[in-house]
Amino acid sequence: KESSAEKFLRQHVDSIDSPGNLSPTYCNQMMLRRNMTKGSCKPVNTFVHEPLKDIKAVCFQENVTCKNGNSNCYKSHASLHITDCRTISSSKYPDCAYKTSQEQKHIIVACEGDPFVPVHYDASV
């Protein structure tokens, strides 16, 4: 079974594709490739284009409260290269269609475990 940490990697980490070179169809391709269009179209998802070590390091940066009230969220000191994928209104499962938006924002992730690693993407600010 996929662990929470593995799920985070699959859903949110894309260290290979460099921002600025992404095509408008990036989200359509990646959401499909990373299994986020199985059974339904995941409405919103964010990919982070930074080295994995830099994403994991966020777990040791600024401690903030998560959206659900938990206290195990951490905000990145720096703004990171991210891509937001959002379903477009005309999109209908199984033909999931996404708008690709490239941004530079601080990320907030929930971390847990030993080693202490990201397990949930909480927000971009």
UniProtKB/Swiss-Prot annotation:
Where is this protein found? Answer: Secreted
Q: What Gene Ontology cellular-component terms does the record carry?
A: extracellular region
As given in the record, the signal peptide range reads none
Cite a single Pfam family from the UniProt record: RnaseA
Residues where substrate binds: K7, R10, K42, P43, V44, N45, T46, K67, R86
Q: List the disulfide bonds.
A: C27-C85, C41-C96, C59-C111, C66-C73
**Transmembrane portions of the chain:** none
Protein origin, superkingdom: Eukaryota
Summarize tissue expression. Answer: Pancreas.
| MF GO annotations | lyase activity; nucleic acid binding; ribonuclease A activity
Q: What is its main location?
A: secreted
Sites carrying a glycan are N35
Q: Which UniProt keywords apply?
A: Disulfide bond, Endonuclease, Glycoprotein, Hydrolase, Lyase, Nuclease, Secreted
Q: Which catalysed reactions does the entry list for this protein?
A: an [RNA] containing cytidine + H2O = an [RNA]-3'-cytidine-3'-phosphate + a 5'-hydroxy-ribonucleotide-3'-[RNA]; an [RNA] containing uridine + H2O = an [RNA]-3'-uridine-3'-phosphate + a 5'-hydroxy-ribonucleotide-3'-[RNA]
Q: What is its EC number?
A: 4.6.1.18
What InterPro entries does the annotation carry? RNaseA, RNaseA-like_dom_sf, RNaseA_AS, RNaseA_domain
Catalytic residue positions: H12, H120
- Per its UniProt record, what SUPFAM superfamilies does this chain match? RNase A-like
Biological processes per GO annotation? defense response to Gram-positive bacterium
Which purpose does this protein serve, as stated in its record?
A: Endonuclease that catalyzes the cleavage of RNA on the 3' side of pyrimidine nucleotides. Acts on single-stranded and double-stranded RNA.
Protein family membership: Belongs to the pancreatic ribonuclease family.
Q: Which PANTHER family match?
A: RIBONUCLEASE, RIBONUCLEASE PANCREATIC
**How does the annotation summarize its subunit structure?**
Monomer. Interacts with and forms tight 1:1 complexes with RNH1. Dimerization of two such complexes may occur. Interaction with RNH1 inhibits this protein.
User: What's this protein's name?
Assistant: Ribonuclease pancreatic
User: Which species is the source of this protein?
Assistant: Spalax ehrenbergi (Middle East blind mole rat)
Gene, per the UniProt record: RNASE1
